[in-house]
Curated annotation (Swiss-Prot):
Residues 5-170, 178-351 form the EngA-type G domain. This is GTPase Der. Residues 438-473 are annotated as: Disordered. GTP 2 binds at residues 184-191, 231-235, 296-299. Keywords: GTP-binding, Nucleotide-binding, Repeat, Ribosome biogenesis. GTPase that plays an essential role in the late steps of ribosome biogenesis. InterPro entries: G_ENGA, GTP-bd, GTPase_Der, KH_dom-like, KH_dom-like_a/b, P-loop_NTPase, Small_GTP-bd. Residues 352-436 form the KH-like domain. It comes from Psychrobacter sp. (strain PRwf-1). Associates with the 50S ribosomal subunit. The gene is der. Belongs to the TRAFAC class TrmE-Era-EngA-EngB-Septin-like GTPase superfamily. EngA (Der) GTPase family. GTP 1 binds at residues 11-18, 58-62, 123-126. Residues 459-473 have a biased composition (Basic residues).
């Protein structure tokens, strides 16, 4: 199983990188994640071209010094550095209207040192001389791809060549086990936990390399059950674990989360809960994945410190009250085995099945115990419910005026379904559909207005009788 290739768009500000990003992803909304506050202004999007999928990074821009001079370190922003090292392929975007300036030359020099494929794009060629892009030959990066990204011109030529060596999308075979993604910040103990889980309990383990992103899919067996462990940090051999050099990659984490059945989020007890931990949990929540939280490095903490962390958990994890939290020591193996029952419970909850009759009965019981509020002088009516999907489970409720149902009542219904089905470790989505009258807005076929209390069919017969009588002499 392989990860998608990663393409980074780099260049000075305002050369059109974001426009190319939107052209590649075919929408201005196709962000995998908005990483504000975590990785500054990088944006990640999914793209597919000629049945080949890849991830695009819009790096936001490499700054320009006031005097137009300076080393590449003066120009390069931190997020661009990270994106360049995450990427498999680099697209260097320059402004054909502005021509080549010092910053372009400095970036070009740096790109020569990376040993990665580089595609040079001369954007904004509309209205400039045909020979204008030629000056960028001096960068030594080959012939520029002329482009007017704002109108989509030239993008196909770039994508033809850029995706030429990418593998076509294929339906991957099931690995034959429950897929677990281990996620977390650097140095929280992900690799130690991975090796502990594989440790003495390993029966048959072999590494299945991903791409240059270093994510590895490792099948293993425990107590007769099969698993596939997705290690976003890369598995180190026993005795060679050095988490000080473990690198965090948003790309690897996001793709592992999407590919997993259950996410195990690792948090460092010694450092406490930080915003980046909440970002990672948010990614899993947005992806609808079942989840278990492991508070690592619990051994050795004072009782006062442990109590502080428990209070902090109650305060900051209130958006995922259904997630099971375990206090472990990956290094010593303390309570690591307790993760497995919670993993299986979370997965079973995410895949539960139930009949429409049973769901509707639970809905009726919930409504009888706590009726919906009035809206516009009328009681909101909820008719029936059915299951709309799995992982995460989706319950669809049909009724009238469902758009007026308060958020508090929606949460009430979600909690009722959770309680009845004992759903633990998985998000639950409750969607509401409006029952529509197929005859609403249509004119009646009768030539006369309906008399009060008279059905349309009876009125029609009366009208016909009246018409026949009117022709008699």
């Amino acid at each position: 199983m392989s990860m998608k290739p990663v393409v980074a768009l780099i260049g000075r500000p305002n050369v059109g990188k974001s426009t190319i990003f939107n052209q590649m992803t075919k929408t201005r909304q196709a962000l995998v994640a908005d990483l504000s506050g975590l990785t500054r202004d990088r944006q990640y999007g999914d793209a597919t071209y000629n049945n080949k999928s890849f991830v695009v990074i819009d790096t936001g821009g490499i700054g320009e010094a006031d005097d137009g001079r300076g080393s590449i370190d003066d120009y390069m922003s931190a997020q661009s550095h990270t994106a360049i090292h995450e990427a498999d392929i680099l697209v260097f975007v320059v402004d054909a209207r502005a021509g080549m300036i010092g910053a372009d030359a400095e970036i070009g020099k740096m790109l020569h040192t990376l040993g990665k494929p580089v595609y040079l794009v001369a954007n904004k060629i509309d209205g400039v001389h045909d020979a204008a892009p030629a000056e960028f030959y001096a960068l030594g990066l080959g012939e520029p791809y002329p482009m007017t990204a704002s109108h989509g011109r030239g993008i196909a030529n770039l994508l033809d060549d850029l995706t030429a060596d990418m593998p076509e999308d294929v339906e991957e075979e099931d690995q034959g086990g429950l897929k677990l993604a281990i996620i977390g910040r650097p140095n929280v103990g992900k690799s130690t936990l991975v090796n502990r889980m594989l440790g003495e309990e390993r029966v048959v383990v072999y590494d299945m390399p991903g791409t240059t992103r270093d994510s590895i899919y490792i099948p293993f067996e425990r107590n007769g059950k099969n698993y596939v462990l997705i290690d976003t940090a890369g598995v180190r051999r026993r005795g060679r674990i050095d988490e000080k050099v473990e690198k965090f990659s948003v790309i690897k984490a996001l793709q592992a989360i999407k590919d997993a059945n259950v996410v195990v989020a690792v948090i460092d007890a010694q450092e406490g809960i930080v915003d980046q931990d909440l970002h990672m949990l948010g990614y899993a929540l947005d992806a609808g994945r079942a989840m278990v939280v492991a508070i690592n490095k619990w051994d050795g903490l004072s009782e006062d410190k442990k109590e502080m962390i428990r209070i902090e958990l109650d305060r900051r994890f209130n958006f995922i009250p259904y997630v099971k939290v375990h206090f472990i020591s990956a290094l010593h193996g303390t309570n690591v085995g307790n993760l497995y029952p919670s993993i299986h419970k979370a997965y079973a909850s995410s895949m539960f099945k139930v009949s429409t009759n049973r769901l509707t009965q639970i809905l009726e019981d919930a409504v009888a115990a706590n009726p919906p509020p009035m809206s516009g002088g009328r009681r909101i009516k909820l008719r029936y419910a059915h299951l709309g999907g799995h992982n995460p489970p989706i319950i669809v409720i049909h009724g009238n005026q469902t758009g007026s149902l308060p958020k508090s009542y929606q949460r009430y219904l979600e909690n009722e379904f959770r309680k009845v089905f004992n759903l633990e470790g998985t998000p639950l989505k409750v969607e509401f559909k409006l029952n529509t009258n197929p005859y609403a807005g249509k004119k009646t076929t009768s030539s006369k207005k309906l008399r009060p209390g008279v059905s349309e069919a009876r009125q029609k017969r009366r009208n016909m009788k009246y018409k026949k009588g009117s022709h008699k002499k």
